[in-house]
UniProtKB/Swiss-Prot annotation:
Belongs to the PAL/histidase family. Contains an active site 4-methylidene-imidazol-5-one (MIO), which is formed autocatalytically by cyclization and dehydration of residues Ala-Ser-Gly. This is Histidine ammonia-lyase. It holds the Pfam family Lyase_aromatic. There is a cross-link at A141-G143 (5-imidazolinone (Ala-Gly)). GO terms for molecular function: histidine ammonia-lyase activity. GO terms for biological process: L-histidine catabolic process to glutamate and formamide; L-histidine catabolic process to glutamate and formate. Transmembrane segments: none annotated. The gene is hutH.
Length: 505
């Protein structure tokens, strides 16, 4: 059970919450702050003060005063009218993440909701009732209004949820779990939907997958180095310390650890003086992608614990301030950066695939074919990888450079952070598939070189891979092989924990 405080949630905890289904509880001190802040909101309503989002309309309607008797209706109308999401739903892990992050930000005690609302969010998490939230429709400011409105709907007993492996009406799940839908009161609708939790939840899942995929890329690249009898000197510690990037040094160190007892690597001048960049520069390129990941992790952990509501309530109600913490620009930039960093792992992987299949670049059978000419072998697998790499280049276009005005120009600059976050996740899926092609080719090359000559780590990795796909002895439908390896990487070597090279033993 992980305790939410509003201040301390980490990526490592999110891994346990999203991927292992661990439960959550609220810190009592944080809940006390929630209750105290709620008293301020109720006094504002009782006194008839004019405060945005509590006793006024929203967006362009911020100048419209709402009567006391209409405050509850205002919140309900807000949720229904803003539930304009479009398209396929977010993965269930993402909607679970939205619930967790929304509760966590409310526990900072500046949003003005009742403890009841926080408790309801936690009930949904712990009972694994996950909102069906369409992926499209958010501008990323004022936060993720449309996606979070779909999240808020289910608290009211409206909309749909994922529950026990099915997609059902929210009331079906609530009834089975013995829960009563809530009725929103002053400010609570706005507090539920004004934030960046859709882009951030998707970003967290993307980061977790990207981290594991990056470790996998090093293991697969190591197998390729063996298949091409690469020069191990290029990974010497002195070379990488001379440049000074710790991530580059760490990648080189892991590659050396993976290949320390390999009989397939060569020394400088033994077969050739130096290797092509796609082998020789693995630490420099992969290390740079790790720099991106470290940046993204830092920004995500800030946002996971951020108050992104509007208005925010401070000093016991002395200050009720309309600000712009809902603007998703920091996450938009981080997700665009993640897109570039991950796309580059696919770029260099595809070039290693080319070196494995091109007979002009190695002494292996052309396209790793068992009967070159009669059988095409891995020829079109390289095509498929090249296609994914090119698709990534389109997806990597920064969403954050775009903005379009909304709400009659009141909201005249937006982040497009949710688009960036969604595209980052798509890129990561493509990267995993490109790496799957590289792994298939590298395993085949290893067989020609002699499996007995592989390092202890890569040999174990090879045998596990061969449980997913057989050796290429005849042409077959290789699409199945690619998907089998992709699924295996994602579900077994995948996003549940950091890949330790020793885990392959």
């Amino acid at each position: 059970m992980i305790t939410l405080t509003g201040h301390t949630l980490t990526i490592e905890e999110m891994k346990r919450l999203l991927l292992e289904g661990e439960g959550v509880t609220a810190c009592p001190n944080s809940m006390q702050k929630v209750a105290e802040c709620r008293e301020v909101v109720e006094k504002i309503v009782e006194d008839g003060k004019v405060v945005y989002g509590i006793t006024t309309g929203f967006g362009k309607f911020s100048d419209v005063l709402i009567q006391k008797d209409d405050v509850k209706a205002l919140q309900h109308n807000l949720i229904q009218s803003h539930a304009c999401g479009i398209g396929d739903p977010f993965p269930e892990e993402v909607s679970r993440g939205m619930l967790i992050l929304r509760a966590n930000t409310m526990l900072k005690g500046v949003s003005g909701v009742r403890p009841l609302v926080v408790n309801m969010l936690l009930e949904f998490v712990n009972r694994k009732i996950h909102p069906v939230v369409p992926q499209q429709g958010s501008l990323g400011a004022s936060g993720d209004l449309a996606p979070l409105s779909h999240l808020a709907l289910v608290l009211l007993g409206e909309g749909e949820v994922f529950y026990k492996g099915k997609r059902v009406h929210a009331m079906v799940a609530l009834t089975e779990e013995g829960l009563e839908p809530i009725e929103l009161e002053a400010k609570e609708g706005l507090a539920l939907i004004n934030g960046t939790q859709a882009m951030t939840a998707q970003g967290v899942l993307s980061y977790i997958e990207a981290e594991a995929t990056s470790y996998q890329a090093e293991l697969i690249a190591s197998m390729t180095i063996e298949g091409l009898q690469g020069i191990i000197d290029a990974f010497d510690e002195n070379v990488h310390k001379a440049r000074g990037y710790k991530e580059q040094v760490e990648v080189a160190s892991r590659i050396r650890d993976i290949l320390h007892d390999s009989k397939l690597t060569t020394k400088q001048g033994e077969l050739r003086v130096q290797d092509a960049y796609s082998l020789r520069c693995i630490p420099q390129v992969h290390g740079a992608s790790w720099q991106v990941l470290n940046y993204v992790k830092e920004k995500l952990e800030i946002e996971m614990n951020a108050a992104t509501d509007n208005p925010l309530i401070f000093d016991g109600g002395e200050k009720v301030i309309s600000g712009g913490n809902f603007h998703g620009q920091p996450i938009a930039f981080a997700m665009d950066f993640l897109k570039v960093g991950m796309a580059e792992l696919a770029n260099i992987s595809e070039r290693r695939i080319e070196r494995l299949v091109n007979p002009q670049l190695n002494d292996l059978p052309p396209f790793l074919s068992p009967e070159p000419g009669l059988q095409s072998g891995a020829m079109i697998m390289q095509y498929a990888a090249a296609s994914l790499v090119s698709e990534n280049k389109t997806l990597a276009h920064p969403a954050s450079v775009d903005s379009i005005p909304s709400s009659a120009n009141q909201e005249d600059h937006v982040s497009m952070g949710t688009i960036a976050s969604r595209h980052a996740h798509q890129i990561i899926q493509n990267v995993r598939r490109v790496l799957s092609v590289e792994m298939i080719c590298a395993m085949q090359a290893a067989e020609y070189r002699g499996i007995e000559n592989m390092s202890t780590v890569t040999k174990s990795f090879y045998h596990q891979g061969r449980q997913q796909v057989p050796s290429i002895t005849n042409d077959r439908i290789f699409s199945t092989d690619i998907e089998n390896i992709t699924h295996w990487l994602k579900t077994n070597y995948s996003i549940k924990e950091r890949l330790d090279v020793n885990a392959a033993l």
